[in-house]
Amino acid sequence: MKNVLSIQSHVVFGYAGNKSSTFPMQLSGIDVWALNTVQFSNHTQYGKWTGMVVPHQQIPEIADGIDAIGELKNCDAVLSGYIGSADQVAEIVKVSHLVKTRNAAALYLCDPVMGSAEKGCVVADGVREGLIDIALPQADIITPNLLELRELSGLRAENFEQAVIAAQHLLTKGPKTVIVKHLGSAGKYPGKFDMLLANREGVWCLSRPLYPFAKDPVGVGDLIAGLFLANLLNGKSEPEAFELTGNAVNDVMEITHKLNSYELQLIEARHAIMAPQNRYKAEKIA
């Protein structure tokens, strides 16, 4: 069994951060060591929430505790997502380094959540800069959305061709693999939910239906990052992991839409996560 140290947000109600990625990774046969960056009542896109940011010192303290009992060497990957403070960024990267000293084959997947005023996703000051300056160069895999792709690359990425160039540019910044979780307005196919995979072997696009939610559910990016990492650790090639992830997430979104839910319906979709319908193919474009 593979083990992932997942350093993300926790919400008591609903699904985002570790609540969105842990259960699907477990369904995929991965043991998840969840370390929370914040504990909130609910995700920030409700517009109001209660809770706290975890003190940044606790992140290395927890990792050191796992190391002290001799288990950190069994960690196969570090996954980071929503970060609660600028100080947490450096601590998370230090933890990824510690894990790699204990297991040289371990991966670091950074899901660079930067927030969006338009969507109501609130991220602390300094996190964006920390992700660009500290996390990006150290990540093996980076999984931005379109806005984050623009911020990380410094390129416009206003259309599909520009998004491909921006993703390829990120490969020169440190990561070996780039997943653009949602191309949005820069998608290849209008009216679809398009994702992109770029690595040194090529570029792939996967297009699936875009479901007409009254309010788009939160936590989809967390789900994508977690499932892609789980599929990789289960021995799939990157294009295979990308395709499996896209199909599993589509099934989750289809079920969530049918139930008219603002929160991801991961429990209802559990069987689909374990055995997704392989309806949508990853198209190699470069």
From Swiss-Prot:
CDD domains: pyridoxal_pyridoxamine_kinase. Its EC number is 2.7.1.35. This is Pyridoxal kinase PdxY. ATP binds at residues 111, 148, 181. NCBIfam families: PRK05756.1, pyridox_kin. Belongs to the pyridoxine kinase family. PdxY subfamily. One of its GO terms (biological process) is pyridoxal 5'-phosphate salvage. Its cofactor is Mg(2+). InterPro entries: PM/HMP-P_kinase-1, PyrdxlKinase, Pyridoxal_kinase_PdxY, Ribokinase-like. Pyridoxal kinase involved in the salvage pathway of pyridoxal 5'-phosphate (PLP). Catalyzes the phosphorylation of pyridoxal to PLP. It catalyses: pyridoxal + ATP = pyridoxal 5'-phosphate + ADP + H(+). One of its GO terms (molecular function) is magnesium ion binding. Keywords: ATP-binding, Kinase, Magnesium, Nucleotide-binding, Transferase. The keyword Nucleus does not apply. It is an enzyme of class 2 (transferase). Substrate binds at residues 9, 44-45, 222. Homodimer. Pathway: Cofactor metabolism; pyridoxal 5'-phosphate salvage; pyridoxal 5'-phosphate from pyridoxal: step 1/1. It comes from Actinobacillus succinogenes (strain ATCC 55618 / DSM 22257 / CCUG 43843 / 130Z). GO terms for cellular component: cytosol.
